[in-house]
Curated annotation (Swiss-Prot):
Originating organism: Enterobacter sp. (strain 638)
Enzyme class: isomerase
Family: Belongs to the pseudouridine synthase TruB family. Type 1 subfamily.
InterPro entries tied to this protein: PsdUridine_synth_cat_dom_sf, PsdUridine_synth_N, PUA-like_sf, PUA_sf, tRNA_psdUridine_synth_TruB, tRNA_sdUridine_synth_fam1_C, TruB_C
Disulfide bonding pattern of the chain: none
GO molecular function terms listed in the Swiss-Prot or TrEMBL record: RNA binding; tRNA pseudouridine(55) synthase activity
Keywords, alphabetical: Isomerase, tRNA processing
Its job: Responsible for synthesis of pseudouridine from uracil-55 in the psi GC loop of transfer RNAs.
EC nos: 5.4.99.25
Name listed for the protein in its UniProt record: tRNA pseudouridine synthase B
Length: 314
């Protein structure tokens, strides 16, 4: 007889985890889920095992709104090793080509400029994108190369930090879907020497405050502290969470009176004053402005429900 599935607690919000190097995003997600004893958890855009930095982990009802973080801008600090190209475009792969580093400062400036603004990027074979239902890296590990279409990306800012010997350090502010490994691989080809990533840190996601990031070790220390004090770990862990609607913070807010919100929460579009002309909105209710879900302005100017909060902490 199978054992009954253990149910976690209903905790809702977004933890800004500082992912350690060497761990997969899913591994650290599961650790956070266990530490919080959460019934649901999901991350918002995987980081490579080599990478560190901000990994927003959505708990409970916040998982419904994680898509908006997948669509948000990101900022990275990256160090590339010049003169070597690898099959994965990072230090975890095998070196497939070595060339001397001979470019000038002017050539570097020109190469960097070519990546700024709106461009097209062909994703790496070592990525989680899917082709015919299978992830690209699964094909790559079998030595199979499959066709990949170039996708539009935007590099809002590409800052030169330093060039010392065979290392080049940059800071990148980019749109969703941008692969930093691919930028470095393409840059190495433009410079004629090849390059791969040896250090990558995600500095920021959307507008989340960097000083709210916490490590797994800090979470474990809080659990131990709670046990020492004889209190629930939730008393120390839950204050670390950002609001469940924070993934959608870029969208305007529409507040509904309680007389209207009951219809909205039952799946019906409602009319209200001072709504945007179109697009998605965050919907709150009452004088407390309690978040109740995402809506979209329909053709009649009503707020139609799109994603609703089912459970909400008291």
């Amino acid at each position: 007889m199978s054992r009954p599935r253990r149910r976690g607690r209903d905790v809702h919000g977004v933890l800004l985890l500082d992912k350690p190097q060497g761990a997969s995003s899913n591994d650290v997600l599961q650790k956070v889920k266990r530490i919080y004893n959460a019934n649901r958890a999901g991350h918002t855009g995987a980081l490579d095992p080599l990478a560190t930095g901000m990994l927003p982990v959505c708990l409970g009802e916040a998982t419904k709104f994680s898509q908006y973080l997948l669509d948000s801008d990101k900022r990275y600090r990256v160090i590339a090793k010049l003169g070597q190209r690898t099959d994965t475009s990072d230090a975890d792969g095998q070196v497939v080509e070595e060339r001397p580093v001979t470019f000038s400062a002017e050539q570097l400036d020109a190469a960097l400029e070519s990546f700024r603004g709106e461009t097209q990027q062909v994703p790496s074979m070592y990525s989680a994108l899917k082709y015919q239902g299978k992830k690209l890296y699964e094909y790559a590990r079998q030595g199979i190369d499959v066709p990949r279409e170039a996708r539009p990306i935007t590099v809002y800012e590409l800052l030169f930090i330093r060039h010392e010997g065979d290392e080049l350090e940059l800071e990148v502010h980019c749109s969703k879907g941008t692969y930093i490994r691919t930028i470095i691989d393409d840059l190495g080809e433009k410079l004629g020497c090849g390059a791969h990533v040896i250090y990558l840190r995600r500095l920021a996601v959307s507008k989340y405050p960097v000083d709210r990031m916490v490590t797994l070790e800090q979470l474990r220390e809080l659990v131990e502290q709670a046990e020492t004090q004889g209190i629930s770990p939730a008393d120390l862990l839950d204050p670390l969470l950002m609001p469940m609607d924070s993934p959608a913070s870029d969208f305007p807010v529409v507040n509904l009176p309680l007389t209207s919100s009951v219809y909205f929460k039952n799946g019906n579009p409602v009319r209200t004053t001072e709504t945007p002309q179109r697009g998605l909105v965050r919907v709150t209710e009452g004088e407390e402005n309690k978040f109740i879900g995402m809506g979209e302005i329909d053709d009649e100017g009503r707020v139609a429900p799109r994603r609703l909060v089912v459970e909400y902490p008291l």
